[in-house]
């Protein structure tokens, strides 16, 4: 038995055999290499010396891969903090867009196109319905984030949208619906279904889709038509969570969803020579946590399913929050509402200062004597220090 193991440990033990027996994409292989070599010295080191006692500190560089569980916290904190300047004292809602599980094989075989289609369908649904005077009649703002996993690391692509519950009408007047969401869920469902299925059908008619693995049967014309009919007939079930309790809760909530990966280290409970045990929420049992044991290679397979395509943008901003609009329109909204501007806490701070603020840890302070440590030039030839000199 192996306690307190990490995802890096799991990859070290099981990935080599998995790679030799499975078809792995270059992007997945790169992510696996990064995870296995993060903070091992493979990506270089930072060497510092204490000005007072001469104690030498060696810090191994991280891989900075967005799929690495050890590399998400710092960029998440910086990203979320930067969003403070876009937040208004206004209603916000969390809307989740899901698709029928029958589409999963097709989506997995065509991630670049069909992930993009999820964003297109979700964003067009929100923008068009919000602009309809029957509902709100405004230009709203929202952030969309793609997640591809369920709690057990199964393939479950869905979009999380953090939606501003009000917006600007054609006369640049602010309108909102108070604490009630301005769009009926059934209308969202039908509109989203129509838009996503239309784009899927268009890709199919233009011969842009590929059919690999469990999607292979849908190469057949009649099988694909039956799949379309099945999904059209189903009621798609997006849902809207209750409004956030103030701007700060929106900021905290963003942190929960923006830089997540399929599974974090704290959920790994045990590892043996052949299996991995991890915790997962059981949504059939009121969301209670349970432990699941699977083979090590199955763990690797599930994890790698969620490596996004190369250069794929997972966090996207729309409407009032788009980069084109937000500087002018968010300022206008803030003036109309009379709400204060939330200032970034970390803006213009260097990494040591951010770490000191967030984690109460001074990386410029010698852990041995408390003196000031300074970096050695990276180009300087470094002779391995004797053990007694290391902090």
Label every PLM stretch briefly:
Residues 1-391:
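Beta->alpha loop/short-helix hinge microenvironment recognizer with preference
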């Amino acid at each position: 038995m192996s306690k307190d193991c990490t995802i890096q440990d799991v990859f070290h033990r099981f990935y080599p055999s998995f790679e030799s027996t499975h078809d792995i994409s270059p992007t997945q292989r790169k992510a696996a290499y990064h995870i296995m070599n993060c903070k091992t010295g493979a990506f270089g080191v930072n060497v510092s010396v204490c000005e007072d006692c001469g104690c030498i500190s060696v810090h191994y560089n991280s891989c900075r891969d967005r799929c690495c569980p050890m590399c998400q916290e710092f960029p998440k904190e910086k990203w979320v903090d930067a969003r403070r300047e876009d937040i208004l004292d206004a209603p916000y809602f969390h809307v989740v867009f899901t698709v029928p599980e029958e589409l999963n094989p097709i989506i997995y075989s065509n991630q670049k196109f069909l992930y993009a289609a999820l964003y297109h369908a979700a964003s067009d649904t929100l923008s068009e319905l919000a602009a309809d005077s029957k509902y709100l009649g405004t230009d709203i703002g929202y952030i969309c984030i793609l997640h591809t996993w369920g709690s057990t690391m199964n393939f479950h692509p869905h979009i999380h949208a953090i939606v501003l519950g009000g917006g600007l009408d054609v006369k640049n007047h602010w309108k909102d619906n108070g604490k009630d969401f301005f769009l009926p869920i059934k209308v969202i469902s039908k509109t989203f279904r129509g838009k996503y299925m239309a784009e899927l059908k268009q890709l199919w008619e233009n011969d842009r889709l590929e059919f690999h693995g469990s999607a292979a049967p849908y190469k057949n014309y009649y099988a694909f038509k039956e799949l379309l009919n099945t999904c059209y007939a189903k009621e798609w079930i997006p849902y809207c969570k209750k409004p956030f309790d103030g701007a700060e809760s929106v900021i905290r909530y963003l942190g929960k969803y923006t830089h997540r990966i399929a599974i974090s280290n704290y959920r790994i409970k045990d590892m043996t020579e052949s299996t991995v045990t991890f915790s997962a929420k059981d949504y059939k049992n009121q969301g209670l946590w349970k432990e699941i044991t699977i083979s090590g290679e199955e763990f690797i397979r599930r994890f790698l399913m969620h490596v996004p395509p190369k250069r794929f943008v997972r966090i996207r901003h729309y409407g009032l929050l788009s980069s084109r609009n937000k500087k002018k329109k968010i300022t206008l909204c803030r003036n109309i509402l009379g709400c204060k501007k939330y200032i970034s806490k970390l803006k213009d701070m260097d990494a040591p200062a951010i770490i000191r603020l967030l984690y109460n840890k001074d990386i410029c302070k010698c852990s041995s004597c408390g003196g000031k440590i300074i970096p050695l030039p990276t180009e300087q030839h470094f002779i391995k220090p004797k053990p007694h000199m290391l902090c």
